[in-house]
Amino acid sequence: MRKLLLAVGLSTLLIGCSDNEVGDVSLGVFTLKDIKITSLHDDKIEGVTCHIASIEANLSLSDPSDSSISCRQTGDITPEMIAAIDKSKSGEVVFKQSKSIFFKTMKVRRIFDPENQTLLYLSYTTKETDGSFKHSLSTVPLWGTKAYNAFQSNQVADQ
């Protein structure tokens, strides 16, 4: 049983390894903590790029839950892309990274706000037991994209 738990723990750590690291800021020699900045490209909405800043503790079994996220439109967003996403109130997970060998995970979830024609990217940390559930939110308005114009045309056609 121990070997199985160790294998699962190590594999989840490898899932969190990212070659999308764009920044690494040391918080000091004696803290042994760094702020890592990674870029995330949404697989379904190719015109969106998010940057996530989170703290990594080098000699710790668990990284702090603090993180921030900033997402921007960096390319075209088409009606076909919006049609392909989960439009439920809970949206869908677009990124997941292990933050601890004790089942703590940072997730980024995409949620669509149809009334305001906006994509929301919610970064949060989950832990199977008690813990602090810190979160951060970034929005990407569809204003000025092909997806927004198509939505507006459909509303006018329905009237």
For the regions a language model picked out, list residue spans one by one.
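Mature extracytoplasmic domains of secretory-pathway proteins
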Residues: 49-116
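C-terminal motif of bacterial Sec signal peptides marking the signal peptidase cleavage site
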Residues: 13-16
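Extracytoplasmic
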Residues: 32, 45-47, 66
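Bacterial signal peptide processing site
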Residues: 18-20
